[in-house]
A protein has these predicted regions:
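Juxtamembrane interface at the cytosolic side of transmembrane helices
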Residues: 1-8, 192-236
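Soluble, non-membrane globular domain cores that form compact, hydrophobic packing
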Residues: 12-24, 161, 187-188, 207, ...
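Short, aromatic-rich amphipathic segments at membrane interfaces
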Residues: 171-207
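Alpha-helical transmembrane signal-anchor/signal-peptide segments
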Residues: 26-56, 189-194
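Hydrophobic secretory-pathway targeting helix
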Residues: 1-39
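Long, solvent-exposed extracytoplasmic domains/loops
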Residues: 60-172
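Early extracytoplasmic/domain-onset interaction patches
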Residues: 22, 39-44, 50-76
Length: 236
């Protein structure tokens, strides 16, 4: 039962307008079939990409391993994957022997890491065709194969107590390989060049949250549903 018609009307108007705004946000009218949430997500991904370029740092880490030889055997999930993994390491100048799904890799660890950084930089710059031309198959799959094979190499290096090499590997994965893969296809945008867009998105998010909250508040207030502190019982 409505207790306060004015409060109820305000709440109803706020919630109905909120619903209309939500429908508009979820419509695919924000370019390339995106809705408002997709647009905002892409915008923030572009901003974060602009501050996630660690290629120079990764190159220094890779170069610190130049002249360090590794000779180890890892196992892929299938013989077909082993062949694809092998293309990565032969491209980095290593000698690779494949037997079924097992690969024995013998080569300069610095050159291997430098190849990974080079591929990651190409992906970060949305130039996947270069990586595809280098190995002859999908660039995302190639980067994923680097990552999967590195997990095996990481375990092998730990087993051999080559902890310095393992640490360098982990840093290159974190600072080059992962950003290259995750941000592939994302446009780079700097916050300094898009201050107005960022301010609008943050302000709208705040307004949208308050908008919904006040709508509920006035609606329930109009229905007589309020939150009050319980009265203290008088002591006898």
């Amino acid at each position: 039962m409505i207790r306060n018609a004015k409060s109820f009307a305000i709440g109803l108007v706020l919630l109905l307008s909120f619903a209309l705004c939500y429908i508009g946000m979820m419509s695919p009218n924000f370019g390339n079939g995106r809705n408002g949430l997709n647009y905002a997500d892409d915008m923030f991904n572009s901003f974060s990409k602009g501050s996630s370029n660690f290629i120079k740092e990764s190159t220094k880490i890779a170069q610190s391993q130049n002249g360090t030889n590794i000779n180890l055997t890892i196992k892929a999930s299938s013989a077909a994957d082993a062949v694809k993994w092998g293309k990565l390491y032969t491209g980095a100048g290593a000698t690779v022997t494949i037997k079924d799904s097992a690969l024995t890799i013998n080569g300069d660890f610095g050159r291997i890491l430098n190849s990974v950084v080079t591929d990651s930089e190409s992906m970060y710059n949305n130039d996947g065709k270069v990586v595809e031309k280098r190995y002859g198959y999908d660039p995302r799959e190639a980067i994923n194969n680097w990552n999967n094979s590195f997990k095996k190499i990481d375990s092998a290096l730990k087993t051999k107590s080559q902890f310095k090499e393992e640490a360098a590997l982990a840093k290159v994965v974190q600072k080059a390989l992962e950003p290259g893969y995750n941000y592939y296809g994302v446009e780079i945008k700097k916050v300094s060049d898009n201050k107005s867009s960022l301010a609008f998105l943050l302000s709208f998010y705040l307004l949208y949250t308050v908008w919904y909250g006040f709508g509920l508040y006035y609606l329930f207030s109009g229905l007589g549903i309020t939150v009050t502190k319980p009265k203290k019982k008088a002591e006898v």
